[in-house]
């Protein structure tokens, strides 16, 4: 907040606290004022029973509740500040993908921006979500581009807030033509197309993941969705109060779910920092991870005068990346800060090992990573491959920052010579 804004706020505060503001002191209400207040109350209360109003009231309460979660779980002022901004960004994303969703006129909503990457999402990826229902049939037309990995997770009805997978396609099973074009049908009957998902028993959304090795060289996939309506060209019906209420409830569910990931997705990792465990999508659910995804999850703890040396074996897979997250599972400043790396931007050491150095700010090591200013947080090592792949768990060594050059001298010297 700028100093001029502070000055304005202070001046306003002083203005209303001086003796000259005695005229602003509460005055006895006249009968006319009382009648006006009663009319205003009556005018607002007559709409209170609307489903959209009730849903919005619940969302307001959840915002307050989530702010208390941040205050209760944060360990530092920085985590509180980042946490409040995280809530703002999470709410914005929930509004984008759920609040603005319309199954009658569907569109793919981008889940992140150049400054927003929350929910443990991969910084080297793009995510899109579209809200659907099974009262309509749909078709998706697109092009797979040249990204390392593309997947469509089609989610059915929700049980206790969690989604079930009713269809999954990746860049191979979409069977694109020579130009990369593909089509995917979502219908309540078989349209006679091999790339088809039966939505007879319900469909709620599709989550699209694009994993990128090198943003400068790879072309993102493109795709659009349309309703297969026999009355093509007819005007989309006006949205109803019930539909808006459902959209607000969906926004609230997404907001509260993402705001509490640090409590629901392996929070015990923070109790035993600087180590990794293995996991896959079965451990999280389709609404969090893709069927092709495998993970090594960990947490970090490092002081300003320290560094973490992360050692692992290079993975022989089509895609992998390592991401540093805050306590709130946010990739802080991901477009301007080195908080993530892929297989395309690392150097393998002469001994065949892959090493990363995580610290507060840049270090001389070629595979350096930045904490984003946080002493503690999560680490996500994800890759795309067969489920029977058994990768060696990375090992984390906590050292003094001043010791880095003596420990990794050869690697650092080689990097500086390039």
Regions found by a protein language model. Give the residues of each.
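C-terminal region of N-terminal signal peptides and the immediate post-cleavage residues
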Residues: 24-27
């Amino acid at each position: 907040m700028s100093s001029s804004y502070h000055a304005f706020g202070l001046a306003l505060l002083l203005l209303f606290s001086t003796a000259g503001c005695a005229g602003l002191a509460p005055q006895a209400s006249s009968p006319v004022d009382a009648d006006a207040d009663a009319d205003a109350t009556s005018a607002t209360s007559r709409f209170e029973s609307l489903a959209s109003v009730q849903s919005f009231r619940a969302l307001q309460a959840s915002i307050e509740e989530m702010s208390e979660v941040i205050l209760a779980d944060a360990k530092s002022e920085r985590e509180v500040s980042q946490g409040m901004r995280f809530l703002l960004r999470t709410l914005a994303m929930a509004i984008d993908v759920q609040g603005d969703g319309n199954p009658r006129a569907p569109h793919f909503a981008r889940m992140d921006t150049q400054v927003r990457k929350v929910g443990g999402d991969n910084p080297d990826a793009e995510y899109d979500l579209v809200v659907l229902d099974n009262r309509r049939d749909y078709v998706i037309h697109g092009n797979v581009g040249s990204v390392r990995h593309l997947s469509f997770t089609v989610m059915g009805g929700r049980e206790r807030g969690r989604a079930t997978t009713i269809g999954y396609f990746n860049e191979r099973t979409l069977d694109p033509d020579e130009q990369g074009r593909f089509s995917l049908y979502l219908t309540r009957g078989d349209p006679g197309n091999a790339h088809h998902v039966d939505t007879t028993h319900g469909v709620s959304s599709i989550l699209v993941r694009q994993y990128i090795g090198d943003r400068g060289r790879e072309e993102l996939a493109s795709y659009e969705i349309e309703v297969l309506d026999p009355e093509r060209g007819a005007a989309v019906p006006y949205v109803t109060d019930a539909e808006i209420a459902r959209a607000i409830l969906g926004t609230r569910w997404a907001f509260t779910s993402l705001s509490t990931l640090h409590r629901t997705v392996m929070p015990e990792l923070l109790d035993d920092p600087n180590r990794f465990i293995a996991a896959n999508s079965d451990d999280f659910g389709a609404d969090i991870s893709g069927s092709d995804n495998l993970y090594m999850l960990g947490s970090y703890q490092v002081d300003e005068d320290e560094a973490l040396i992360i050692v692992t074996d290079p993975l022989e897979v089509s895609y992998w990346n390592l991401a540093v997250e805050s306590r709130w599972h946010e990739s802080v400043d991901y477009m301007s800060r080195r908080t993530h790396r892929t297989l395309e931007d690392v150097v393998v050491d002469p001994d065949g090992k892959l090493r990363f150095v995580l610290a507060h700010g840049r270090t001389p090591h070629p595979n350096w990573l930045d904490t984003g200013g946080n002493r503690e947080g999560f680490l996500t090592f994800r890759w795309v491959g067969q489920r029977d792949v058994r990768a060696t768990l990375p090992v984390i060594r906590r050292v003094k920052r001043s010791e880095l050059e003596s420990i990794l001298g050869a690697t650092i010297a080689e990097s500086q010579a390039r």
